[in-house]
Amino acid sequence: MLGNYSSATEFFLLGFPGSQEVCRILFATFFLLYAVTVMGNVVIIITVCVDKCLQSPIYFFLGHLCVLEILITSTAVPFMLWGLLLPSTQIMSLTACAAQLYLYLSLGTLELALMGVMAVDRYVAVCNPLRYNIIMNSSTFIWVIIVSWVLGFLSEIWPVYATFQLTFCKSSVLDHFYCDRGQLLKVSCEDTLFREFILFLMAVFIIIGSLIPTIVSYTYIISTNLKIPSASGWRKSFSTCASHFTYVVIGYGSCLFLYVKPKQTQAAEYNRVVSLLVLVVTPFLNPFIFTLRNDKFIQAFGDGMKHCYKLLKN
């Protein structure tokens, strides 16, 4: 029966509704956020790589997290900006749409895994400080990163393949600023109920699976902190986890709102807002969350700026 339908070979993305003036304001806002996101995360990556004081597992993981933030936001934001500037050009081929969705989901899965790894790292640092260098040695965290990258990209092969095995004949218009899976399911002329349920279960498995080590780690961290008699000691212990905990709340919260829902094809406005939180706001906040209250990083960054100034002066 599906043979009578012709599937779309390209999609037109509606992006953001509104007048040309509104689009220009959105373009200026998102371009500024994107530029600050890239520059801020690049600064962290360079500082972590060149400063010997930051050669520890947590900063190694932070550097990888910054790389991921740049890659994740770059999967959709440049195309979104182009669409705001020239709305009539928001056309994407089926192959490009599949590639964008695959990269976005794979990098997102990898980011969740990395957040879980960083939580375990904080657990070891707080609860087993004397064994930290033994447990989190160089070979351990390098293998953890390799496994995370491999699993991140392998885990999303079937979900994306299953999505693009559908026939998209209801419409070639996606009411979003990137190739959102919910919108793709919405324009399919096939019954997607079972497929949506399987995708929902996989999203639950990935998100909750990476959330478990985070919850367990912070349970032990809080338990250990409560045993510290002095308030200053408690604050010092928790300060090592505060930035990561803040990032976890924002990251997992937005992912749960966006993906862990039985019905993937819910309101486009809702998906657009939460997608902006994942693709624009969180990557933008990342450099500030991890560095503003980190005295060690601020010192390293200051030393680096002084060194650059001396080189330029000479």
Curated annotation (Swiss-Prot):
Localization of this protein: Cell membrane
- Give residue spans on the Extracellular membrane side: 1-24, 86-99, 162-196, 261-271
Q: What's one GO-annotated cellular component?
A: plasma membrane
Q: Which Gene3D superfamilies match?
A: Rhodopsin 7-helix transmembrane proteins (1.20.1070.10)
Show which residues sit on the Cytoplasmic side of the membrane: 46-64, 121-140, 218-239, 293-314
Q: Which UniProt keywords apply?
A: Cell membrane, Disulfide bond, G-protein coupled receptor, Glycoprotein, Membrane, Olfaction, Receptor, Sensory transduction, Transducer, Transmembrane, Transmembrane helix
- Entry-linked Pfam families: 7tm_4
- Name the predominant localization: membrane
Q: Write down the InterPro entries for this protein, in alphabetical order.
A: GPCR_Rhodpsn, GPCR_Rhodpsn_7TM, Olfact_rcpt, Olfact_rcpt_6C-like
Please give the start and end residues of each transmembrane region: 25-45, 65-85, 100-120, 141-161, 197-217, 240-260, 272-292
**What is the membrane topology here?**
Multi-pass membrane protein
Q: Which residues are glycosylated?
A: 4
For this chain, the annotated S-S bridges are 97-179
- Recorded GO terms, molecular function? G protein-coupled receptor activity; olfactory receptor activity
Q: What does this protein do?
A: Odorant receptor.
Record-stated family: Belongs to the G-protein coupled receptor 1 family.
Q: What name appears for this protein in its UniProt entry? A: Olfactory receptor 9A1
Q: Which organism is it from?
A: Homo sapiens (Human)
Which classification does the entry list for the species? Eukaryota, Metazoa, Chordata, Craniata, Vertebrata
